[in-house]
């Protein structure tokens, strides 16, 4: 039982010189002393480290977990390159860019499709703004044409093995095969994966210190908030090798259904990010995928100056090639210089020194 003064009885009286004294309330003083004692005890006698569930044997044959060798790295497929070192100390992401291209079936006896000028400019943007140690070009059928001849010396070509299935589920469409192949490249090699219609507008350096980074793709439904996107778009993937998030993403293909478009390439990674938020760094739709593809956004990007890519601070622009082909297929060095619009202003720095001469020769052949 507490003494009377601690139970709200007499207050504490502290005598002072010259017959003065201070009267203090008893209970607060007691609580203060107890709190101080608890704090000092915690500082000088920290709690022991947590023990694993159960109790280790006292047997002399016990091998402590601290003595275990590091686990071996996963078996890397021969068609995926070894991870490169990151660009700077502290970065986690290897200094490499990956493209996956040419998986679309080609009739026997035919060559690959001609690389379009807009794709050449996109790869030039990565070369100029990312300055990677290597640009890996994973392919089944190599492209052809003058723009390919210009960009090819800057690429490391990798003849790939196209996955036909995953976890026993068939991959019938070449786009789904490309989805899986890019994840395999990120798992075993790491770096920055880019779709062929991604224009890099500034360096990614500040994004390379986190194991995995993805960007939101906004929903075309205006009733949904910015934090309720369509998903996380796989047109840009930034990752270290063997990241937990990429492993989860690949494992999710156990439920793959080729009849549901974009389910595992956009919707599923957002679901995984919400379930495991510390495993992936998520950027808003304004980082990579803005302006969007719906409504008049593509038209505004190619016909007006409404959007300023430099002032926006965004890292890249996804050109939505399948929907913007009417604009992209007509690009030329001259049209980019002469026509004032948001897209042309953004891509002008990527025009190469031989583009005008090459375009004239190409045009004569068409």
From Swiss-Prot:
GO terms for cellular component: plasma membrane. The keyword Cell membrane applies. Disulfide bonds: none annotated. Residues 1-24 are extracellular. Residues 46-366 are cytoplasmic. Signal peptide: none annotated. GO terms for biological process: fungal-type cell wall organization; glycogen biosynthetic process. The chain crosses the membrane at residues 25-45. Pfam families: Gly_transf_sug. It is found in: Cell membrane. Keywords: Cell membrane, Cell wall biogenesis/degradation, Glycogen biosynthesis, Membrane, Transmembrane, Transmembrane helix. It is a single-pass membrane protein. Its main location: membrane. Disruption phenotype: Leads to an absence of beta-1,3-glucan and a strong decrease in alpha-1,4-glucan from the cell wall, a decrease in intracellular glycogen at 37 degrees Celsius, cell wall organization defects, and scattering of glycogen rosettes throughout the cytosol. Decreases survival in macrophage-like cells and leads to a decreased fungal burden in the mouse lung following intranasal inoculation. Simultaneous knockout of GLG1 exacerbates the glycogen synthesis and virulence defect. The keyword Transmembrane applies. Plays a role in the localization of glycogen rosettes to the plasma membrane. Required for correct cell wall organization and may facilitate the connection between beta-1,3-glucan and beta-1,6-glucan in the cell wall. Belongs to the glycosyltransferase 32 family. This is Glucan organizing enzyme 1. The gene is GOE1.
